[in-house]
């Protein structure tokens, strides 16, 4: 499980065995079942999660009770309610497992300690943050400038393996269309 994390980090920076042992000591392993919540709205967010196996959805529930899927995350991706995590405030998003999911968790204190102690790790997390911002910017621009079919085709092009795994009803909700409309896109 930790070897997956090492390979992920070493796509960005190289680590000696001693450095990785230090990194590894700051994470804990958690396992969740399908439909189980990793984070629930209203809770304090204690961790950022590296997904070793499984699939999750990040969801916001508006005042009328409607669910809005913000993102999906699968293996080799990081997920959390990052605002709540970094500010140590209550979550405005829920993170729910679509499949049985195994994660490596890092607390904010351990994250800060690792970044202070190992400049390489700080560089790694900075790059992850930059790519996360790019993904969020692309998502917003897509919502503003593309129709649902164009968003579906872009998602299919960028993340074909994700589209294959996410249930069609959730994919439709993410795209803001009915399941029937999504079926027409697929044909």
Regions found by a protein language model. Name each.
Residues 146-187:
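Phosphate-/nucleic-acid-contacting segments
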Residues 91, 110-147, 151:
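A small-molecule sensor/coupling module
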Residues 1-28:
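Cyclic nucleotide-binding regulatory module and flanking cytosolic helices
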Residues 14-16, 30, 102, 142-145, ...:
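Localized chelating/binding microdomains
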Residues 59, 81-82, 113-114, 155, ...:
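Residues that scaffold the ATP/ADP-binding catalytic core of kinase and kinase-like folds
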Residues 30, 49, 71, 96, ...:
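Residues that recognize and position ribonucleotide moieties
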């Amino acid at each position: 499980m930790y070897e997956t994390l090492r390979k992920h980090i070493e796509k960005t920076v190289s680590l000696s065995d001693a450095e990785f042992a230090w990194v590894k000591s700051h994470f804990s392993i958690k396992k969740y079942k399908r439909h189980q919540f990793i984070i629930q709205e209203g809770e304090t967010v204690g961790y950022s999660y590296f997904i070793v196996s499984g699939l999750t959805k990040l969801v916001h529930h508006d005042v009328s009770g409607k669910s809005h899927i913000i993102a999906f995350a699968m293996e080799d991706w990081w997920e959390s309610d990052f605002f709540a995590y970094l500010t140590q405030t209550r979550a405005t998003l829920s993170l729910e497992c679509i499949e049985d999911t195994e994660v490596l968790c890092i607390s904010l204190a351990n994250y800060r300690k690792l970044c202070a102690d190992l400049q390489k790790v700080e560089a790694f997390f900075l790059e992850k943050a930059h790519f996360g911002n790019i993904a969020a910017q692309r998502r917003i621009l897509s919502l503003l400038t593309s129709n649902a079919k164009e968003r579906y085709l872009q998602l299919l092009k960028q993340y074909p393996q994700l589209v294959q795994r996410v249930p069609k009803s959730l994919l439709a909700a993410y795209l803001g269309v009915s399941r029937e409309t999504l079926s027409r896109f697929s044909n």
